[in-house]
């Protein structure tokens, strides 16, 4: 999260619009140095030591591409195309193996009804970066701060939240992975589609234990959204799925 505060209060643009710094414009200019329109992150050494895909990962991406209906996914999202017109394996790969720089929200000034010509005295933006294995969250935070300083934005206040989670990855060959695959086939009649998350990384950096986060929600469940939902059928199958995972894992 970054913030810039300039004056003690917002003032009319006619009084100081051409003479004083504009916090929202400073934020906009700073953001433009972070990522290009083709999604390349410009922070120095951001891709240093980036995880390289092996034969196992490439084969799994191809298999996943054959099973995921990207057209249905676009319809669910309400979009006509993915970023950079990606399709097929490239779209699947981007979801799992590409670092991101996402703007969650921006706040500044007045956007209400009527006329008001002010220069806001403060602007805030909240950004999240999704990392891949071998990328250290703390080092990445320092890279962001240094990037802003090097580009003339050292006056921006950068607040890094403590909830940064280290990325991690396990092989599909692990016992727990195989148990989940078998359980999904038994309960749902097909292999699971597992997308990358790193919630467990906070624990696993202290005590390593192969872990997989898997779900059973229905398409359109809108996880984490105000209208998050689950069908009763999926809820019941989820109970059976959890039991099948434990049973299969005990046999591995």
Give residue ranges: language-model regions.
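A common structural junction motif
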Residues: 34, 38, 145-154
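An extended, acidic, His-containing surface patch that forms the Zn2+-binding/catalytic region
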Residues: 44-122, 130-143, 151, 155-252
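Active-site-proximal alpha-helical segments within enzyme catalytic domains
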Residues: 28-33, 124-125, 242
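Short, small-residue-rich loop/turn micro-motifs
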Residues: 1-8, 215-220
């Amino acid at each position: 999260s970054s913030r810039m505060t300039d004056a003690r209060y917002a003032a009319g643009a006619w009084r100081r619009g051409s003479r004083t710094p504009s916090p929202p414009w400073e934020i906009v200019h700073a953001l433009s140095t972070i990522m290009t329109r083709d999604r390349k992150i410009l922070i120095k050494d951001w891709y240093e030591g980036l995880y390289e895909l092996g034969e196992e990962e490439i084969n799994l991406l191809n298999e996943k591409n054959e099973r995921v209906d990207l057209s249905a996914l676009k319809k669910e999202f309400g979009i006509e195309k993915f970023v950079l017109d990606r399709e097929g394996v490239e779209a699947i790969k981007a979801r799992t193996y590409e670092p991101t720089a996402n703007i969650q929200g921006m706040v500044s000034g007045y956007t209400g009804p009527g006329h008001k010509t002010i220069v806001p005295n403060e602007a805030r933006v909240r950004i999240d970066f999704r990392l891949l294995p071998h990328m250290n969250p703390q080092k990445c935070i320092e890279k962001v701060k240094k990037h802003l300083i090097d580009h003339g934005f050292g006056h921006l206040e950068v607040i890094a939240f403590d909830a940064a989670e280290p990325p991690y990855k396990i092989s599909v060959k692990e016992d727990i992975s195989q148990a989940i695959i078998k359980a999904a086939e038994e309960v749902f009649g097909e292999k699971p589609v597992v997308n990358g998350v790193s919630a467990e990384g906070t624990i696993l950096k202290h005590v390593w234990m192969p872990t997989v986060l898997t779900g059973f929600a229905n398409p359109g469940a809108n996880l984490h959204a105000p209208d998050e939902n689950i069908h009763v059928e999926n809820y019941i199958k989820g109970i059976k799925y959890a039991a099948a995972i434990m049973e299969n894992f005990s046999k591995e």
